[in-house]
């Protein structure tokens, strides 16, 4: 299982054969920094550093321990802690790094149906290492690192519709 990371219920992954957490399963591809969107029954994450950027989106069914399954592809391969948010039906992925450039891309997926991400719109600036929070209607995105310096910019989108921040 050279290219797989083991998932643990404590929210960590490892290639080690032991851990303090209870085994959950394996990811389709290993990751260094990715992101996730979760609703009551499914966790979805995309992008990776394995050892390079990735456009792969994986998911697991939260109620059932087991290996991750390929969900689809992001519109742009990326890594470096893009941020994400989700409503009960849609997951959104903000920004990241496509090496050598930061991204302003926003992608979305319908969480209940596996498939490729679709372009949602753009953030106001290229960024990486951002953060996001949400309720079922709105996602708030903190830009994070813009041009090698942190910024204090918050932006939002309405999850059910597409468009720029």
Task: Locate predicted features.
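Polar, enzyme-active/binding microenvironments
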Residues: 1-165
